[in-house]
Amino acid sequence: MHYDTITLTLKDDIAVITLNRPHVMNALNTQMRAEITQAVTQSGKDARVVVLTGEGKAFCSGQDLGDRQSVANLDLERTLRDEYEPMLNAIINCPVPTITALNGPAAGAGANLALAADVVIGAKSSYLMQAFSKIGLI
């Protein structure tokens, strides 16, 4: 399977899913959420463990707010229900252990993505930030 926003490697029964939009600190867009969901679901069948990490200096900066067209047309309820919930549930319900290798900041939805795994291992440069907790988005 070919992915545009992530990479998936499988070696020695270890699936490594790498968020691969480093130019936007691996910000989540609709395509990336769908690809993560699909890759985790498939890896749960093919691997004995799934590792999530990010390319570049960040794990994930959260929702891609730089794509003005997508943000202008964003239906938050639909996006949470139809995109974020399936992505997070794929990780939470994965039949094999899931590990987040936190290589830098994980903010907002990126922090939630990181914390959905069974185990989170962070580099010294990593941190989690809940950017929208004051409006109930955690």
What are these regions (language model features)?
Residues M1-E55, N89:
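Conserved CoA-thioester-binding segment of acyl-CoA-metabolizing enzymes
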Residues I17, L52, D64, L113-L115:
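Hydrophobic/aromatic residues within transmembrane alpha-helices
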Residues M32-I36, E83, L113:
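Hydrophobic alpha-helical membrane-association signature
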Residues D46, G54-A90, A106, K134:
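Glycine- (often His-adjacent) and acidic-residue-rich active-site loop
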Residues M87, I91-N93, A101, A107-I138:
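CoA-thioester-processing core
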